[in-house]
Design a protein with these regions (language model features):
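N-terminal/domain-start alpha-helical segments
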Residues: 1-110
Length: 110
């Protein structure tokens, strides 16, 4: 059975590109386009990895991560355009397993 990835990303073109690359590599991908939906799916579904944008509508990625960590320990990689050291430290302190800045090569996620 393929590993399942939840991709929470509000930029539809980027989400589609990442989804296609991951599916090509054999992963099963479910998408959410806002933080609230992403959190709901993360808490109700079974995922091997969550790729989570920080700047999302409805609920920020950081808030999604904080709430998620109260109930689940699913690995989370934050995807963001924020590249300041303070942002990376904040993300990792909040419970992210990794922090990848945009733009990125798909190989950084595999």
């Amino acid at each position: 059975m393929a590993e399942r990835i939840l991709l929470v990303e509000d930029e539809e073109k980027l989400a589609r590109m990442v989804e296609l690359e991951l599916r090509y590599e054999g992963y099963e991908v479910e998408k959410a386009f806002d933080g609230r939906t992403g959190l709901e799916r993360a808490l109700t579904g079974e995922f091997d990895l969550i790729l989570l944008d920080i700047m999302l509508p409805a609920l920020s990625g950081m808030e999604v991560l904080r709430r998620l960590r109260k109930e689940r320990q699913t690995p989370v990689i934050l995807l963001t355009a924020r590249d300041a050291v303070v942002d990376k430290v904040s993300g990792l302190d909040a419970g992210a397993d990794d922090y990848v800045t945009k733009p990125f090569a798909i190989e950084e996620l595999l």
